[in-house]
Swiss-Prot record:
<keyword id="KW-0597">Phosphoprotein</keyword>
<keyword id="KW-0206">Cytoskeleton</keyword>
<keyword id="KW-0963">Cytoplasm</keyword>
<dbReference type="GO" id="GO:0005813">
    <property type="term" value="C:centrosome"/>
</dbReference>
<dbReference type="GO" id="GO:0021687">
    <property type="term" value="P:cerebellar molecular layer morphogenesis"/>
</dbReference>
<dbReference type="GO" id="GO:0010977">
    <property type="term" value="P:negative regulation of neuron projection development"/>
</dbReference>
<keyword id="KW-0524">Neurogenesis</keyword>
<feature type="zinc finger region" description="C2H2-type; degenerate">
    <location>
        <begin position="26"/>
        <end position="51"/>
    </location>
</feature>
<feature type="modified residue" description="Phosphoserine">
    <location>
        <position position="146"/>
    </location>
</feature>
<dbReference type="GO" id="GO:0005737">
    <property type="term" value="C:cytoplasm"/>
</dbReference>
<dbReference type="GO" id="GO:0010975">
    <property type="term" value="P:regulation of neuron projection development"/>
</dbReference>
<dbReference type="GO" id="GO:0140059">
    <property type="term" value="P:dendrite arborization"/>
</dbReference>
<keyword id="KW-0862">Zinc</keyword>
<keyword id="KW-0479">Metal-binding</keyword>
<keyword id="KW-0863">Zinc-finger</keyword>
<dbReference type="InterPro" id="IPR057038">
    <property type="entry name" value="FBX41/ZN365_Znf-C2H2"/>
</dbReference>
<comment type="function">
    <text>Involved in the positive regulation of oligodendrocyte differentiation during postnatal growth. Involved in the morphogenesis of basket cells in the somatosensory cortex during embryogenesis. Involved in dendritic arborization, morphogenesis of spine density dendrite, and establishment of postsynaptic dendrite density in cortical pyramidal neurons. Involved in the regulation of neurogenesis. Negatively regulates neurite outgrowth. Involved in homologous recombination (HR) repair pathway. Required for proper resolution of DNA double-strand breaks (DSBs) by HR.</text>
</comment>
Length: 408
């Protein structure tokens, strides 16, 4: 696109130079189109300086003496014929183009081929004026020749007058043309300056356009890189979100597992605590029963009193166990209840069988004294027995952890 605009600007410069060449209206007939002049005086000086004398004489003849050959015919003609000739010359000049070949008008019937090369271009107005002046001069010379005046002097004077008048006309036309050419030259210089300004502005705009295009390409590259990075970041964000969701699901699952494990642990601890409490109660009950049996064997209580006391103690312990029990207590399990009750009953049967072999009198005496001795305060003689019982209780307490471990 820039190359085409540069070529168009170059063609415009060439057209302007061609227009400058066209503004020179007069060309040399011998040199051609490449030699042009602004005025007729410059063309004449060129012809006198550059070309031969024969060519100059032909040019003067063709430009100044075309009407002298027809003076004899015009003398015998009348004024209406002169008007007809004027109209005829006007028609001829109208049929011709803007520049007329004077040599072809004056020497139309010449046999020499060389003079046809000499062609002087003149405007149509010059030809009309020159022909009218020749006709008037011929009409004036006719009565003078008839009166007997010398025709050669009149012709020379007329030629000098016509040449002087023609030179004045040519100078006036040259001045007018020069003024017009100067005006056109100024306008051309102004247009050329404007064109140079426009061309400089065009070059500046072209450079700005190239800079803008370069920046546009750089910005396009940056935008492409940014779009690619955004796509990569979006993909990474999606992957991280998926990973986060998966981790959250794992955390939720692990939390559920921990909650279930904690709940099971709490339940297990509660059950274990209930079981240990129940076991301790049963151990305590067994110790008390053992102490009671030992005291019964030592004191010789009767069988009925022992059964009554055992039932009272067992009922009281059972009520305490039920009051202190938990929802998940081991006492509520039927298998453990049956196990402990069967074991206790077998132990009680053995104690009953041992007591059955004792004497009836001693049993009756012990029955009478058993309530009093059981509920009376301790004496000095019985202090050792009580201390022995107190010492026996910590030993059983020391044995509790081993039993609990074995049970667990």
């Amino acid at each position: 696109m820039q190359q085409t605009t540069f070529e168009e600007s170059r063609y415009r410069w060439q057209d302007s130079l061609e227009n400058v060449a066209v503004c020179l209206p007069f060309r040399c007939p011998r040199c051609g189109d490449h030699t042009r002049f602004r005025s007729l005086s410059s063309l004449r000086a060129h012809l006198e300086f550059s070309h031969s004398y024969e060519e100059r004489t032909l040019l003067t003849k063709c430009s100044l003496l075309p009407s002298l050959k027809d003076t004899d015919l015009l003398r015998s003609s009348e004024l209406p014929k002169q008007g007809k000739l004027l109209r005829g010359h006007a028609k001829v000049t109208k049929q011709k183009p803007s520049y007329v070949n004077l040599y072809s008008i004056s020497h139309g019937h010449s046999k020499d081929p060389k003079p046809f090369e000499m062609v002087a271009e003149r405007p149509v107005s010059y030809v009309q004026t020159y022909t009218a002046v020749d006709i008037r001069a011929d009409s004036l010379d006719a009565p003078r020749s008839s009166s007997g005046l010398p025709t050669q002097d009149t012709k020379a004077a007329f030629e000098a007058h016509v040449r002087e008048k023609f030179n004045r006309m040519v100078e006036a036309v040259d001045r007018t043309i020069e003024k017009r050419i100067d005006k056109l030259t100024k306008e051309l210089a102004q247009k050329t300056a404007e064109l140079l300004e426009v061309r400089a502005a065009f070059v500046q705009l072209t450079q700005k356009k190239q800079e803008v295009q370069r920046r546009e390409r750089a910005l396009h590259k940056q935008v492409d890189v940014a779009v690619e990075m955004i796509a990569v970041l979006k993909q990474r964000l999606t992957e991280s979100e998926e990973e986060l969701l998966r981790k959250e699901e794992e955390v939720v699952t692990f939390n559920h597992f921990l909650e279930a494990a904690a709940e099971k642990e709490v339940q297990g601890k509660a059950r274990l605590q209930d079981f240990i409490e129940n076991l301790l109660q049963r151990v305590e009950l067994a110790e008390k029963q053992l102490e009671y049996y030992q005291s019964q064997q030592a004191s010789g209580f009767s069988h009925d009193t022992s059964e009554h006391m055992l039932t009272d103690i067992s009922s009281s312990r059972k009520s305490r166990c039920l009051s202190r029990g938990h929802q998940h207590s081991v006492c509520n399990h039927p298998e453990l209840k049956a196990h402990f009750h069967l074991k206790g009953r077998s132990y009680l049967k053995k104690a009953k069988d041992e007591r059955a072999g004792m004497q009836p009198a001693k049993a009756i005496h012990e029955q009478a004294e058993s309530p009093r001795e059981f509920f009376r305060p301790a004496k000095k003689g019985e202090h050792l027995g009580l201390s022995r019982k107190g010492n026996f209780r910590p030993k059983m307490a020391k044995k509790k952890p081993t039993a609990i471990v074995n049970i667990i």
